Amino acid sequence: MDEFHRCGKEDSFWQQCFLYPLFFKEDLYAISHDHYLDVSSSSRPMEHLSSNDQLSFLTVKRLIGQIRQQNHSIVLFVNCDPNPLADRKKSFYSESVLEALTLVLEVPFSIWSKYSVEGMNESKSFRSIHSIFPFLEDKFPHSNSILDARIPYSIHPEILVRTFRRWIRDAPSLHPLRSVLYEYRNSTENLQRSIIVVPRVNTRFFLFLWNYYVCECESILFSRLKRSSHSRSLSHGSFPQRTHFHRKIKHIIIFSRRNSLKSIWSLKDPKIHYVRYGERPIIAIKGAHLLVKKCRYYLLIFRQFYFHLWSEPYRVCSHQLSKNCSSSPGYFLRVRMNPILVRTKMLDELFIADLITDEIDPIVPIVPIIGLLATEKFCDISGRPISKLSWTSLTDDDILDRFDQIWRNLFHYYSGSFDRDGLYRIKYILSLSCAKTLACKHKSTIRVVRKELGPELFKKSFSKEREFDSLPFSSKAAARSQRERIWHSDIPQINPLANSWQKIQDLKIGNLFDQ
């Protein structure tokens, strides 16, 4: 594959026109075979791994020959072998061919994605979720409106195949892809004759499909916004959710002035900022209300004409930043005014001026998190701590470590908020729930548990020093960090409680739209 990459730099046209012969390379299936065994060994016991898991290249060639037929029935995933291992053999060869198909498609896509968006010449890898917030702090306070939309999951398989034709001219290589997509659609029994492309399916093929789908949407969207908005700048950041392409892109695209600037869209310094985390894009706009309505209308038309997806107008929300909050990964986001007192001394006179700046204010959703803690049986619905009965069979150290880990992860994730009073309310709930769990285990009271285990035990587990022990700061810097917000670069995924709240929030919005 590395050799194919090197050849592709010299002749990219060969990549786009002759992908199909790669399906008959034995090295390709050796790679897919090893990857399949690695995944299987982690999910199956060792006694289920036998010598029968050997790849027959002749069987693979026959299977590819069947896929080449114009029959969209169960060609890829049907095995007529009557022996008891037929189901496992069927899955074995299916996964191997699917893995090989993904490897072939990933090579031209990785090259195409670098040049898919015009003007994107800077691409860096950021695996931390908190990398989204510095981008928001830099761009969003200067905007006055937000368009909140979500990338639709449902898409017809033929639409995906047609979009692949834009950058793959080798028609035979599209037949296996079409067969796989139609087979997946038929297996889900979808009445709308479409497939659901989600990044949470833990297979390499669907992760690639999601990355391609998102990149295709964004490349077309950016180019059209560039032509239609006539704005002077457009910045964007992309934060895929734990897929193969982790990146943050931030670049300014300068638009040429045209005669159309004399029209109604000749606004004073309009700007568009695009940021995406996972399947949720947010577009921040600085400009008049007409520009916001135009972008919102374009998003609906874009989905309808390019991907044949009908979306009701109210499914693309627009609201003003100064009056409403927007929910991002685990936070409520709003723009607040920050007054600054400036003193200037000139000769013998002292001038005092008040400057007001806008800044992003991330708010921790305390009440929803307490509701989630009540669902997990750490407290009741009013926030009163209760014992975690399912953990009473654990040792004392395990109980303390689990409660302490929940608190540290929660505080670590929400360290970017100025107001942490609500966080310490959650700390109180967790610490008292921990004490009640230990008391329930030993069939005694909290006072007896504190006396037997020592009063310093809970202070050690829930101390403020342990909240900042992962920071490479001195003690003075750690004390100062309690009054400041910190964005961490070591958070690979959203906090489970924050993720649960975000899903509930999205579900409420969806139900509100469906009414």
From Swiss-Prot:
It is found in: Plastid, Chloroplast. Keywords: Chloroplast, mRNA processing, Plastid, RNA-binding, tRNA processing. The keyword Plastid applies. The keyword Plastid applies. GO terms for biological process: mRNA processing; RNA splicing; tRNA processing. GO terms for molecular function: RNA binding. GO terms for cellular component: chloroplast. InterPro entries: Domain_X, Maturase_MatK, Maturase_MatK_N. Usually encoded in the trnK tRNA gene intron. Probably assists in splicing its own and other chloroplast group II introns. Belongs to the intron maturase 2 family. MatK subfamily. This is Maturase K. It comes from Pinus contorta. The lineage of its organism: Eukaryota, Viridiplantae, Streptophyta, Embryophyta, Tracheophyta. The gene is matK.
